[in-house]
Amino acid sequence: MKNQVTSIGQSKRLIELGVPADRASMVYRKTNIVGIVRLEVKKGKGGVVAPAFTVADLLAVLPKKIMTNGGKVHILHIEACSSTSPCWCLYWGDEATQVGWQERISFLHLLEDAIEWLCLNGYKLNL
């Protein structure tokens, strides 16, 4: 699941960046066993330690288009990299212009990095 759902630390960072906790479709919840936290689909309210964002949750908050300062609209592209090792790349634009380029082996980390780039560069999330 670590490649499909954010960790508690990743979730907290995404919330700091502006991703609303209610966009997470899962939560980390305390159990009756001391020191044990489990991941589960949202239900009920008790014992929630942190939200857990899935790949689908993060894809939903990425804008499909962004506009740069020059007024040019760039469309979101996500694809497998053409490098020798398996990886993913994400950017807005086309073959000539690529804005917000991210490249990671983990698809989850790719989405997390893209959200961070958007927020730190003044772009709005799809909320």
Give residue spans per PLM region.
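Glycine-rich anion-binding surface patch
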Residues: 1-127
